Amino acid sequence: MMSLTVLSPPQRFKRILQAMMLAVAVVYMTLLLYQSAYGYPGIQVPHSQVDALASEAVTTHRDQLLQDYVQSSTPTQPGAGAPAASPTTVIIRKDIRSFNFSDIEVSERPTATLLTELARRSRNGELLRDLSQRAVTATPQPPVTELDDIFISVKTTKNYHDTRLALIIKTWFQLARDQTWFFTDTDDHYYQEKTKGHLINTKCSQGHFRKALCCKMSAELDVFLESGKKWFCHFDDDNYVNVPRLVKLLDEYSPSVDWYLGKPSISSPLEIHLDSKNTTTNKKITFWFATGGAGFCLSRALTLKMLPIAGGGKFISIGDKIRFPDDVTMGFIIEHLLKVPLTVVDNFHSHLEPMEFIRQDTFQDQVSFSYAHMKNQWNVIKVDGFDMKTDPKRFYSLHCQLFPYFSFCPPR
């Protein structure tokens, strides 16, 4: 005959507590498995998260209101050479009166509406879920970055279509044809066909001056935001991009985290002085910026924070206010307004540094290269291959060094 065991109240309480702990553990493990497999496909960023950011960008500068603009010239970049460590700040005298950020429109429509539209247009529904991962106790591993996750933009102009653009199309563009877009200032049916529709006429002014540069960068940023890609990488039309190395680099970082990857061309931060009539002391802003001539990359999480401040053409307005070119304006927005530091990646290279010092046995490790023709001399890499008359910019020789299977490469 079976006997019933009567548990005392403390024993019953202990059993109930054990059952509850088991249930919590099962639910927790289920959530972890679901998160790792599916993420958060339906997530929307709350109003407060982005509105607070936009508010900070406006209100933190209201105490610095001054009276009028005083125009000043754009500073020239320092000469070539690797930046040396220096405690001295580079001081750019920029006497701007009435530096007023209260008149920068944060958003013409509610932020949630803008982000909802971005999510709907996105070809990858899981992109926005990454924004909440830092608030989760058990954060999954960063997602693997593939070539198709990257939006590569190249800034060019009509006068360089037959020279710089043609050289890129024959070389590294062939490794990223679906991911690379050229931003120019005219219609060109020939190169529109050569790029399979990847030539965008920004309607910006022609020329290499501040207004035109900021206009094109603004267009690049807006097109990226609509693309749904995880990474935005900007390059100039005198850059050679080592596409596999770029993918490998970005795979080391998560697009869900605020990343500003690039390389400065100066050895210390840029300092802008703001003169005020209302105070006895000058205001100053200090920040780093990645030089556009070497290329730089932004994570999607960071660009979404930039959206209310610089999206929809507002990038141009900020460039007009500080009166600096596009790459400096980008650094001002990211480092100064959003307080996201530049992460220096030495594998980016611009024509402002001597190319000959990049060793041939390290070519496969570099992300970008460049060239320049100054004072009747070429600033180019030293690489075996075609002669200087055939390949003065050394891009064909470099390409064949990295990818010898291309048809125009000489047999080894």
Swiss-Prot record:
Q: How does it sit in the membrane?
A: Single-pass type II membrane protein
| Source organism superkingdom | Eukaryota
Identify the InterPro entries for this entry: Fringe (IPR017374), Fringe-like_glycosylTrfase (IPR003378)
Side of membrane Lumenal, spans: 35-412
For this chain, the family text in UniProt reads: Belongs to the glycosyltransferase 31 family.
Task: Cite the binding residues for substrate.
Answer: 164, 237
Requisite cofactors: Mn(2+)
> Which keywords are on file for this protein?
Developmental protein, Disulfide bond, Glycosyltransferase, Golgi apparatus, Manganese, Membrane, Metal-binding, Signal-anchor, Transferase, Transmembrane, Transmembrane helix
For this protein, what is the EC number? 2.4.1.222
Q: Which residues cross the membrane?
A: 16-34
Disulfide cross-links: 204-215, 233-297, 400-409
Kindly indicate whether the keyword Zinc belongs to this entry.
no
GO BP of this protein: compound eye development; compound eye morphogenesis; cuticle pattern formation; dorsal/ventral pattern formation, imaginal disc; female germ-line stem cell population maintenance; follicle cell of egg chamber development; germarium-derived egg chamber formation; imaginal disc-derived leg morphogenesis
Catalytic positions are: 327
Q: Where in the cell is it found?
A: Golgi apparatus membrane
Gene3D superfamilies in UniProt: 3.90.550.50
Query: So where does Mn(2+) get bound?
Result: 238, 351
Function of the protein: Glycosyltransferase involved in the elongation of O-linked ligands to activate Notch signaling. Possesses fucose-specific beta-1,3-N-acetylglucosaminyltransferase activity; extends the O-linked fucose on the Notch EGF repeats. Boundary-specific cell-signaling molecule that is responsible for dorsal-ventral cell interactions during wing development.
Spans within the Cytoplasmic topological domain: 1-15
What's the protein here called? Fringe glycosyltransferase
* GO CC aspect terms: cytoplasm; Golgi medial cisterna; Golgi membrane; Golgi stack
Q: Which GO terms describe its molecular function?
A: metal ion binding; O-fucosylpeptide 3-beta-N-acetylglucosaminyltransferase activity
Per the record's keyword annotation, is Metal-binding included, yes or no?
yes
Q: Which gene encodes it?
A: fng
Q: In which tissues is it expressed?
A: Expressed in dorsal cells.
Which Pfam families would you find in this protein's record? Fringe
